[in-house]
UniProtKB/Swiss-Prot annotation:
Residues 1-17 are peroxisomal. Disulfide bonds: none annotated. The gene is PEX3. The chain crosses the membrane at residues 18-39. This is Peroxisomal biogenesis factor 3. It is a single-pass membrane protein.
């Protein structure tokens, strides 16, 4: 038999095996290619997911840091307003100092003319007594009010920013889901039997845009109303602090006159007692006193506040839908009533105490006259002037100071208190809440 015939005969006999082998090899190659493709695709998706998670974390971190900066900028904007409120409520220390200078000039003129018609010395003594009392009241009131204001602002902005972030994330997810549905060919083929998908999509987009615009305006007004709650402590709430502090100062400094002398340690001890007794009245069970200082007690107080901060059109629109506002206020109230908030506010007040004692001590020592370097006791009049200067520094702001580099040292000190940052992070990262919010005290 010829070789060619033997080869053909061999192939014919093993043709089935060859075909099976080739088919198996092709199947293995195809399967391997598919497996490699899906593995690469899975790895790509995993890498993309990790990248997205990292981006989201960085975005959340940047938004958090920006929110804390915005809180500080807000305080810079509010301080000049409250400074005017203090001056209107008879706590303008510069006015008293001006009157003292006028009295000194009048006394000089009276001596030169040998006039006996008036007794400026008595009036001057009254002014010094007034300066002593009001400088103490203003200094302590400023520490409590500004500490509370920066805490309230942090809570407000972190709650609001987190809420906005959640809303935007939900809307983005819904948009992606809708887009995926429209891109699904089978879905489009089925729906095309009873309607034109393009017309339906256009109508839905128009209606959604109108609805979104209306809801966006309502949400914006609700958020503005929520932010305007700081009006309360600047115009009403601080008066509660002022009343408590005034009573404590009158008790602690009773019988201490401007010419009487105290050491820095004695002055610090008396001031410590004032802070301790004030804290005991503010931080009671459930922080009810603190809540009434920071927020209106009832709906009538809330309505009065909103009438002072919103224009007529915005107020009308607000009353048509207050859902978002009520949700935000409920969470803010729960935050204020929590133990964590009490701890943070006490930390801010303690930091304020150390700040003012350091400043008052430096300013008092600096007022020593030549030859008095070893003097350890100072007249209350000297303390009063030092406290006046300290108050001025604590409330000092210039136009755009927070952006231009002119920093209020007191605000910078409070802004760097670690428990405040911890509470802010806790509120901001409370992503377990839904639109109804649920902060745990």
């Amino acid at each position: 038999m010829a070789p060619n015939q033997r080869s053909r005969s061999l192939l014919q006999r093993h043709r089935g095996k060859v075909l099976i082998s080739l088919t198996g090899i092709a199947a293995l190659f195809t399967t391997g290619s598919v497996v490699v493709f899906f593995v690469k695709r899975w790895l790509y998706k995993q890498q993309l997911r990790i990248t997205e998670q990292h981006f989201i974390k960085e975005q959340i971190k940047r938004r958090f840091e920006q929110t804390q900066e915005d809180s500080l900028y807000t305080i810079y904007e509010l301080l000049p307003v409250w400074r005017m409120v203090l001056n209107e409520n008879d706590l303008n220390l510069d006015s008293i100092v001006t009157q003292l200078k006028d009295q000194k000039n009048q006394l000089t003129r009276a001596k030169s003319s040998e006039s006996r018609e008036s007794s400026p010395l008595k009036s001057k003594a009254e002014l010094w007594n007034e300066l002593e009392l009001k400088s103490l009241i203003k200094l302590v009131t400023v520490t409590y009010t500004v500490s509370s204001l920066i805490l309230l602002t942090r809570l407000q902005l972190n709650i609001l920013t987190r809420n906005e972030y959640l809303d935007s994330a939900i809307k983005l997810t819904m948009q992606q889901e809708n887009c995926n549905k429209l891109q699904n060919r089978f879905y489009n083929w089925v729906t095309s039997w009873w309607s034109d998908p393009e017309d339906k999509a256009d109508d839905a987009m128009v209606m959604a845009a109108k609805k979104s615009k209306k809801e966006g305006q309502e949400v914006y007004i609700n958020e503005q109303a929520f932010l305007s709650l700081s009006w309360w402590i600047l115009n009403k709430g601080w008066l509660s602090y002022n009343e408590i502090i005034t009573n404590q100062i009158e008790i602690e400094f009773d019988g201490i006159h401007p010419r009487d002398t105290l050491t820095l340690e004695e002055f610090s001890s008396r001031l410590t007692n004032i802070f301790r007794n004030t804290n005991s009245q503010i931080f009671q069970q459930n922080n009810n006193n603190l809540t009434s200082i920071l927020l209106p007690k009832d709906s009538s107080g809330q309505e009065f506040l909103l009438s002072q901060t919103l224009d007529a059109d915005a107020l009308t629109s607000f009353h048509s839908n207050t859902l978002v506002f009520n949700q935000l206020v409920n969470e803010l109230t729960q935050c204020i009533e929590s133990t964590a908030t009490s701890i943070v506010l006490e930390s801010l007040i303690n930091e304020s105490f150390h700040f003012i004692m350091n400043k008052v001590g430096i300013k008092t020592i600096a007022k020593k006259k030549p030859g008095q370097e070893d003097q350890q006791q100072y007249q209350m009049a000297v303390f009063a002037m030092s406290m006046k200067d300290c108050c001025q520094e604590m409330l000092q702001t210039t136009a755009g100071s927070s952006h231009s580099g002119s920093v209020n040292e007191y605000l910078a000190t409070l802004d760097s208190v670690q428990p405040l940052d911890d509470l802010s992070a806790s509120v901001y990262s409370n992503f377990g809440v839904s639109s109804s919010f649920s902060f745990k005290p």
